[in-house]
Each structure stands twice: as structure tokens, then as C-alpha cells.
């Protein structure tokens, strides 16, 4: 940081402030995590200098023999982790991985059956404000009002009625195990392809703590951060027979040069995911989520679906007469970072919401376990009970900071 602070103190100070925020606060945003020093070193390496349009062994630039090594390592490790024939590690994000799949198997105007964003889906699963909702005809399924779980009967009925070309499974705010085999059976019945977006649960899948979609889906996409604990980026997994088309849709279809420094960092993270400690880490993520959910439930909070099977929980604050926006602000003042989130059958604007989403990957990476979740849960309950009590929120913030600074950002 010395050289950066000397050359550009404005940017350098912003980074230092962010280090302080991450170190002194509790990160409970379910889609965020902390990476190892090795991953950061790969991402900050001289590979950022290199243009490498194309794929290993078939580039449009010279001098790619060493970045080819890095990309091939990433591909082979991804295939080993997830037991698949094909992996494309070039997508810059999960959204671009999804776009690559859509362009590989759909034409503009084709029908997609995806999960409603307010029920836990994702923007790229057909939201009208996203490219997926602009280019394609989208039909949405959701969760059952009584259980908060995916309504598979509704999925099947909508599939039979609308005959989608593609069914999209996967979510950004769904706390329960997804039945990928059932989705595939529905897709086969109506002649649709199945894409699973496992961005949130990829790390759990890699470690065996969530059933894998790879054997059921025609296409599987993911981010490489979140529970997979790598750099921010995307990836597509499939069978070898889909490889040529998928490759061409990523490059030259929607991207130019791949980010070779990020791909190298992906390779490092995938190497970490193949180690025994990664499986232990993922178990702790799930155990911590269950412990935190237990604290909140005992305090009278309503969790969508009644709990969690994975790394996240969705807290419906309707009965507490607190909006998601107000809860997010109060928790931030208390040193706890979350995001406001819509809940199924939402009545408020997405800028206000009735819920917050909480996740345990980042705190688990710092070395926290179930005992620490008891403390964290207590602070969450206290802060939400005192959203307008600035004095108490400041007191909680001081307690949180003293606690948080006992843990490194990366303990695994």
C-alpha cells in the first residue's frame, strides 16, 4: 500500500478505510466473502497486463503460453470439483455466464420459466429491468405462501401451459435445498432445457453440503465468489457436446479479452476448494447459519420457510413493524452489514422492502463458530429493537468492533 498511498493517496485512503470497515464490522451479506492472500496475490499479479482473446492453445495474440497454463489449471480444477466434462472460466460475472447460456440455447422472444425475483430469484432470471426480461418472454414461478418453499406443482403447471424453451432453477435469496432432479423431470416432460444458477450455493455443492445440479442440468452457471470463496467472476459448467457453442457465445459472443489475472485467482481458489479444510469450512458455514437462525427464531423473528438449509436466511420483519430499509440502516450503525431484501408476496417497494437477508460465509471465513453466532444474533435482535435509539446503536457498534477485531479476515 505504500506506493499506492504515495502516488494516489485519495484512492489509497479509500482502500484503507474499506479495510477498516471489513475488519471492524460484521459482514452478513450472504453474497459476500473474504478471500485468501494467495487469491489476492494472483489477482494483483502481472497477468493483468496480458490480452488473451480466444482459448488455451487457440489465441488471437502471441505470448499466451503462460496464461494458458493458468487457464488450463482453472478449467481442470473446476471439472474435478464439480465432476463435469466442460468448464468455461472466462465469464467476467455470473450475469455474463447466464447471458452466455441464454445466447447458446435461445433466440430473442423464446420463453423462459424462472423464479420470481421477489420470491428469491435473480435479476438475470427474467426480471423486466434486466436484459433477460427484455430479450425473452418470461414466465415466473414462486414459493408457496404457507411454507415459503418452491411450489414445484406450480412450476410443472406453468411449464405445461407455456412450453418454455428454458427453465431456470437457482436463487439469490432462497434458504432451502433445491430439488434439481424434480426440475429436470419437469423440463424433460415439456421438452425444455434446464439451466441451474448455483451462484449462492456453489461452495456448498463443492463440499457436498447441497445436492449437485451438474448431473441434472443441461447448463450450470455460478459465480466464483460467494460460498466458493474466490475472486469476483463467473463460470459455466456443462457437457462436452455443448462446449463449442458455449465457448463461442462467451468469446466472441459477449466478451472480448478474458481477465487473465482473475482467471489465475479462480484457479487458486479452486485449488483451495479441493483441500479437506474447505469441506470443514462449508460445514461450519451451514452450522453457523442454523445457529444464527435459531437465535432469531427464539427471539420471535419470522424466517421465510421457517429456517435454513444452507448459508443464508431471509428475515421477514412485517410482524416487527420495521422495514428492511430501516433495519439495514440501524444494523449498519450497530456495525453489522446486511442488505434489505424483498420477501415472498412483498407489499413494499424493493427500495424499502419488508425483510433483510443474512448469510454466514464471511463470518465463518473469519473463524467464527456457533458460539459467536449467539453473540451476533443477540446484537441483531438488540439493534432491530432499537432502530431509533442512536445511543444504544452506538453502544452496540463499540461492542461489535471490539469483538470483530479479535478475528482476522481470513482464518482458513
Curated annotation (Swiss-Prot):
Catalytic activity field: (6R)-5,10-methylene-5,6,7,8-tetrahydrofolate + glycine + H2O = (6S)-5,6,7,8-tetrahydrofolate + L-serine
Involved pathway(s): One-carbon metabolism; tetrahydrofolate interconversion; Amino-acid biosynthesis; glycine biosynthesis; glycine from L-serine: step 1/1
HAMAP family reported in the protein's UniProt record: SHMT
Domain of life according to the entry: Bacteria
PANTHER family assigned to the protein according to its UniProt record, in alphabetical order: SERINE HYDROXYMETHYLTRANSFERASE
Family statement: Belongs to the SHMT family.
NCBIfam families on file: PRK00011.1
Protein name from the UniProt record: Serine hydroxymethyltransferase
Localisation per UniProt entry: Cytoplasm
